[in-house]
A protein has these predicted regions:
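Short, surface-exposed "cap/lid" segments of acyl-processing enzymes
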Residues: 46, 54-106
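The feature captures the conserved acid-bearing segment of alpha/beta-hydrolase catalytic domains
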Residues: 180, 185-249
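Gly/Ala-rich beta-loop-alpha elbow adjacent to hydrolase catalytic centers
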Residues: 152-157, 161
Length: 270
């Protein structure tokens, strides 16, 4: 029998469960005021964002960080009351980015209270058409204001980053993933888990972004994402100079800040 289990449960493991307010305070404490809060109202739920926009000229590029699944589950059978991350790692990485224009996008129902935020959204529907559609609209708005967009996804946010990269190849110049679940279908097969409910066709995405600069970072100590996902992806694009798979001395949640501090600007030549 397949068991429904998600990245957030694997990551959560033995971490202490903090209240919503405490988790919100964590990201506020990381922010020194250089990032301003923006709420995207694009549909049935709002999306929380923190943004540093120092140059508003249209010609400027922007770096967009997309959060992982967060705290979706407390244990295998108990959904979290909200999916706000226990550790705002993705925003910490965004803070290390010294580019003038940087946007952090939380996932659906993270860092906000909304009457439409039902548990199904972060336990079953995180990659469904209505939810993914919110990020498609956000990307469209961002692309209207910037001539070049670089996407970075952490953990489960990698799927969304890769999907968005396939939609606007004219504006999206690169996609990078960090400890990313870059193939959820293969992930569920390798671990014998229930499949995600998703509107994303990963086979089509892979073909559409094969000519976009891609770097996929995985941790040598990562116990969450099977390394076979990366080796299989690398084999698929063995002769494609646009795609780079890079091993980092990190686990799924630890070691990335040290690495990112000196490598946030690395892009694969394509």
């Amino acid at each position: 029998m397949r068991i429904i289990i998600f990245l957030s449960l694997l990551i959560f493991n033995s971490c202490s469960y903090q209240s919503f307010d405490k988790r919100v305070n964590l990201i506020n404490n990381v922010n020194d005021g250089s990032f301003k809060k923006v709420i995207y109202d694009k549909g049935f739920i709002d999306i929380f964002s923190l943004q540093k926009i120092e140059n508003r000229q249209e010609v400027q590029e922007v770096i967009v960080y997309i959060e992982g699944d967060g705290l979706s589950w407390i244990d295998r059978f108990t959904p979290s009351s909200d999916p706000t991350p226990v550790d705002p790692l993705t925003f910490k990485l965004a803070k290390l980015d010294q580019n003038p224009n940087v946007i952090y996008l939380a996932r659906s129902c993270q860092y906000i209270r909304n009457n439409e935020c039902r548990k199904e959204i972060w336990t079953k529907l995180q990659y469904s058409k209505p939810v993914i559609g919110l990020y498609e609209e956000i990307l469209e708005e961002i692309a209207q204001r910037h001539s070049k967009v670089h996407l970075i996804g952490y953990s489960g946010g990698s799927v969304i980053a890769m999907h968005l990269a396939s939609l606007d190849k004219k504006k999206v110049k690169s996609v990078r993933t960090i400890a990313g679940n870059i193939n959820p279908n293969e992930f569920t097969k390798l671990l014998n888990l229930s499949s995600y409910q998703t509107s994303i066709n990963l086979d089509l995405i892979d073909d559409k972004i094969k000519d976009i600069s891609q770097t996929h970072y995985y941790g040598s100590k990562d116990k969450v994402i099977p390394k076979e996902i990366y080796s299989n992806y690398q084999d698929q694009y063995l002769n494609n100079s646009c795609v780079q798979i890079t091993k980092v001395n990190a686990s799924h949640t630890k070691g990335w800040q040290k690495f990112w501090k000196n490598n946030y600007n690395l892009l694969q030549n394509c």
